[in-house]
UniProtKB/Swiss-Prot annotation:
Tissue specificity note: Isoform 1 and isoform 2 are retina-specific. Isoform 3 is found in retina as well as at lower levels in adult and fetal brain.
PTM annotation (Phosphotyrosine): residues: 417
Example GO molecular function: ionotropic glutamate receptor binding
Source species: Homo sapiens
Protein name: Neuropilin and tolloid-like protein 1
Domain CUB: 41-155, 172-287
Extracellular side: 23-344
Function: Involved in the development and/or maintenance of neuronal circuitry. Accessory subunit of the neuronal N-methyl-D-aspartate receptor (NMDAR) critical for maintaining the abundance of GRIN2A-containing NMDARs in the postsynaptic density. Regulates long-term NMDA receptor-dependent synaptic plasticity and cognition, at least in the context of spatial learning and memory.
Length: 533
């Protein structure tokens, strides 16, 4: 039993010793970290014309596991020249992968790199192209060395050599705070900080409420000389206005939102005399991290903003959660009323115009059809037939008793030609009084069957033999003789008009020559005999 108690005492003592050792080790580690923090990466002396800075413990060996950042800023229209002392020693390695010094041309760790240096040979003289140099010293956990000492001075920027020395800049600072606010460059002119012809280097200090951070969102941004950071830029600092706290710098055509980690933000605008048209407008919002309190609104992006910022017409969250579903809460403004009225008027006017266009198209389509139907109804077929139908010849008979048997021959000859086409010529002499050529073609007169029957019914002279039928040539000659010789001797009182098959009177009736058979039989017989000879 006693032996068991002794074992327990031994185990307990060992545990106590272990805990005391761990506590001591933790205390030593905390002390070491505090010492490293208090060392501040060597010394740094600044003055108006330049300065000097060194690695930690220089000229003794620098400590392991150390990283130091040095950012040098010159005045406007000045550049930086950096020199390393000859007493220089940093652990050598291939491409300086271990301990090294890295120099960049600008204020950020992503600025263009100038070079990375290590070994026993000090780097050459380094010149910046602008107002800033970014320098980093890194030491790993093994093989420490003496380190470095560097000095720098400011020189005039050759890009502004023709403009001469910069005039003293006017004091231009602003103080702002609260749950939200707007920072804008127009405040410089409104508050009389500088004239329109002066270069400006203004700063806005924004202070958030306790336990709050700051979110910055650009509402308007334009640089007169884009991509020329020496002439105009907008810079954002997080925590102070020193170059070490520079968060972002904008001098191109785009500016992004910035989320600060502290409750103090600094906005800086630089513009020389030829860049005073540069402008910006920025909204700052104070927020707290979740969990959100009762008087705050959760933005779904690890932001809790004041309830008074919800549905205020401005997007205070990273995403517009605070302005969604706010139409029923917002009062209709005069601009909204005018917009709605204008939209109604435009819509009604557009409908009226469309209706008028449709009516016009319908009228234009139906109007030609109406005219065509009207013209078709006005067409008189009788007039058309009167113009194009050839004339109809009417027969006339003699009331006298001196007719001979020649009428029978004439009737027979006319009956043979009653189916011929009607003549379209208006000249009777071309058909009946023409030359031998017209006689051979024959007349185009169309005697109907009724007309021929009238001729056959006429009485003949008994005792006289009928004249035998004649051929077509002889009949045509006789027709010519009738129209030429007997036309002048035709007595109107002895003529009787015989109705024809024409359904109406032609407009050429006055020009129709009626065939008159007069004279003595001897005269016809003599002409007939003469023709046969």
């Amino acid at each position: 039993m006693i032996h068991g108690r002794s074992v327990l005492h031994i185990v307990a003592s060992l545990i106590i010793l272990h805990l005391s050792g761990a506590t001591k080790k933790g205390t030593e580690k905390q002390t070491t970290s505090e010492t490293q923090k208090s060392v501040q990466c060597g010394t740094w002396t600044k003055h108006a014309e330049g300065g000097i800075f060194t690695s930690p413990n220089y000229p003794s060996k620098y400590p392991p596991d150390r990283e130091c950042i040095y950012i040098i800023e010159a005045a406007p229209r000045q550049c930086i020249e950096l020199y390393f002392d000859e007493k220089y020693s940093i652990e050598p390695s291939w491409e300086c992968k271990f301990d090294h010094i890295e120099v960049r041309d600008g204020p950020f760790g992503f600025s263009p790199i100038i070079g990375r240096f290590c070994g026993q040979q000090n780097p050459p003289v380094i010149k910046s192209s602008g107002r800033f140099l970014w320098i980093k010293f890194f030491a790993d956990g093994e093989l420490e060395s003496m380190g470095f000492s560097a000095r720098y001075n400011f020189t005039p920027d050759p890009d502004f050599k023709d403009l001469g020395a910069l005039k003293p800049l006017p004091a231009c600072e602003f103080e702002m705070g609260g749950s939200e606010g707007i920072v804008e460059s127009i405040q410089i002119m409104k508050e009389g900080k500088a004239t329109a012809s002066e270069a400006v280097d203004c700063k806005w200090y924004i202070r958030a409420p306790p336990r709050s951070k700051i979110y910055l969102r650009f509402l308007d941004y334009e640089m007169q000389n884009s991509n020329e950071c020496k002439r105009n830029f907008v810079a954002v600092y997080d925590g102070s206005s020193s170059v070490e706290d520079l968060k972002a710098k904008f001098c191109s055509t785009v500016a992004n939102d910035v989320m600060l980690r502290t409750g103090l933000g600094v906005i800086r605008m630089w513009a020389d005399e030829g860049s005073r048209n540069s402008r910006f407008q920025m909204l700052f919002t104070s927020f707290q991290e979740p969990p959100c309190e009762g008087n705050t609104f959760f933005c779904h992006s690890n932001m809790c903003i004041n309830n008074t910022l919800v549905c205020n017409g401005l997007q205070n969250c990273v995403y517009p959660w605070d302005e969604n579903h706010c139409k029923e809460k917002r009062k209709t403004s005069l601009l909204d009323q005018l917009t709605n009225t204008s939209g109604t008027v435009i819509g009604v006017t557009s409908c009226i115009v469309i209706i008028l266009i449709i009516i016009s198209v319908i009228v234009q389509i139906k109007q030609p059809r109406k005219k065509y139907v009207q013209r078709k109804s006005d067409f008189d077929q009788t007039v058309f037939q009167e113009v194009f139908e050839p004339p109809h010849y009417e027969l006339c008979t003699l009331r006298g008793t001196g007719a001979t048997a020649d009428f029978a021959d004439v009737a027979d000859d006319f009956e043979n030609y009653h189916k011929l086409r009607r003549s379209s010529s208006k000249c009777i002499h071309d058909h009946h009084c023409g030359s031998q050529l017209s006689s051979t073609k024959g007349s185009r007169s169309n005697l109907s069957t009724r007309d021929a029957s009238i001729l056959t019914e006429m009485p003949t002279q008994p005792g006289k033999p009928l004249i035998p039928p004649m051929n077509r040539r002889n009949i045509l000659v006789m027709k010519h003789s009738y129209s030429q010789d007997a036309a002048d001797a035709c007595d109107i009182d002895e003529i009787e008009e015989v109705p024809t098959t024409s359904h109406r009177l032609s407009r050429h009736d006055k020009a129709v020559q009626r065939f008159c058979l007069i004279g003595s039989l001897s005269k016809h017989e003599s002409e007939y005999n003469t023709t046969r000879v």
